[in-house]
Amino acid sequence: MNQHSHSKTTVIDGITLNLSKPDTTNPEWIGQSEVLKQVLACWMVISDKDLPLSPRIIGMPGIGKTTLGMVAALERKQPLYIYQCTSDTRPEDLIVTPVLAESGKISYHASSLVTSMING
């Protein structure tokens, strides 16, 4: 990956892809420590060959699902990429968005999902 004007890029099949920046919010988790422990336990691995579990966190809006994920990522010292899906989210929004740059050229911007897959 290259550092270019404060944004990271990578080249895939000759196309430069601008990567999303990780979330830098530092939320605080208050109460329900057991729920946080359960999410952290899902992501534990014993060896490099292990794959972590993928917990599905469901619930009504505003109950702290995103905050839980943010705090868990902070505890693990891992970068966090957030994508808020809405009713008008299109499949292409989840992948790469072509953007007309000031120079008149098209630049390609990876979604948070694609960036996290590239970064591992």
Identify the residue ranges that each predicted region occupies.
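AAA+ P-loop NTPase catalytic core and its hallmark functional loops
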Residues: 1-120
